[in-house]
Amino acid sequence: MTNLRKTHPLMKILNKSFIDLPAPSNITSWWNFGSLLGICLIIQILTGLFLAMHYTSDTMTAFSSVTHICRDVNYGWLIRYLHANGASMFFICLFLHVGRGLYYGSYLFLETWNIGVLLLFAVMATAFMGYVLPWGQMSFWGATVITNLLSAIPYIGSDLVEWIWGGFSVDKATLTRFFAFHFILPFIIAALAGVHLLFLHETGSNNPTGIPSDADKIPFHPYYTIKDILGVILLVLILTSLVLFSPDLLGDPDNYTPANPLNTPPHIKPEWYFLLAYAILRSIPNKLGGVLALVLSILILALMPLLHTAKQRSMMFRPFSQCLFWILVADLITLTWIGGQPVEHPYIIIGQLASILYFLLILVLMPITSLLENNMLKW
């Protein structure tokens, strides 16, 4: 009798993706983050679903409905904080996943990489709209400031902003549509993640050496299922520790004040995972220039395959490129710190220098260094 998992139309797809999938024998824990992102997405969809059962997307009741969830709903506080901190875990895994891709040259799988960039944009859009829903001070003013950036687009900008707002300011119409989009986008993300996997399995996984590993493959199950379970246990442990011991560690105290259009908070800043892009936006005095830099800071990832000048795929055997990669990581941490600081000396100049260094590293220094390494190896 043939094995059901190899013959059943549905089981066959799962079998080829998660059980009998040939995987390189030498992939490290850096390859765990794909599965962790899948777990994060499942956690977010489930907790979000239960929150949506009690949330009301009306400006008059949104804030009190979140309060009601935390105080009156059974384990509502747990669901709410799992959802809020789950987003932070999602972005930590995302940044590490993208960083792994940059370090080991995974961006040379063009379709997989481009869908990954699209996924990053979709997750950022979802997180931004989710932050608006509790209708606290930072929700309202964050929504006002970020949506207002679109007014920098020549000719159609101001019309576009009013069209997104559904009026002349961030109000009931804005909140309702943000809730609708925040609800539907995770399912679109799940579908895109499926396509991301589909393209990945067309080529097979990359590995730390960057050398094709067709001659040395092992089955995904049990080797990498066990390895992934360890990652999941650590992820859940960190997330539950954060939720149970310090749920507001990554949030903003201003968001516990109901939204007030007549009172601007002293420092408007987004959640920590947007601070690096926010710092790049703020470092350019011109509005349109800032918006372009903001978009390019993420869109630059799509250019990575074009900027790859090295003869070797991975950075594993390229010490100079490794140095620049870790300088880039330090630069991104600096930008994250600057994004949370007030706009005053010396933070302005540090932010501007860090922003210049970010683009300089990716567009100029790293490709030149790769060419230099090729030359040193007589390639």
Swiss-Prot record:
GO BP annotation list: mitochondrial electron transport, ubiquinol to cytochrome c
SUPFAM superfamilies membership: a domain/subunit of cytochrome bc1 complex (Ubiquinol-cytochrome c reductase), Transmembrane di-heme cytochromes
Residues noted as binding a ubiquinone in the record, renumbered to the chain: 201
Keywords tagged on the record: Electron transport, Heme, Iron, Membrane, Metal-binding, Mitochondrion, Mitochondrion inner membrane, Respiratory chain, Transmembrane, Transmembrane helix, Transport, Ubiquinone
A Gene Ontology term for the protein's cellular component: respiratory chain complex III
Keyword DNA-binding assigned: no
Residues given in the record as heme b b562 binding sites: 83, 182
Residue ranges of the TM segments: 33-53, 77-98, 113-133, 178-198, 226-246, 288-308, 320-340, 347-367
Location relative to the cell: Mitochondrion inner membrane
GO MF entries: metal ion binding; ubiquinol-cytochrome-c reductase activity
Cofactor dependence: heme b
Cofactor notes: Binds 2 heme b groups non-covalently.
Keyword Transmembrane helix attributed: yes
Binding site for heme b b566: 97, 196
Subunit organization: The cytochrome bc1 complex contains 11 subunits: 3 respiratory subunits (MT-CYB, CYC1 and UQCRFS1), 2 core proteins (UQCRC1 and UQCRC2) and 6 low-molecular weight proteins (UQCRH/QCR6, UQCRB/QCR7, UQCRQ/QCR8, UQCR10/QCR9, UQCR11/QCR10 and a cleavage product of UQCRFS1). This cytochrome bc1 complex then forms a dimer.
The protein's name in its UniProt record: Cytochrome b
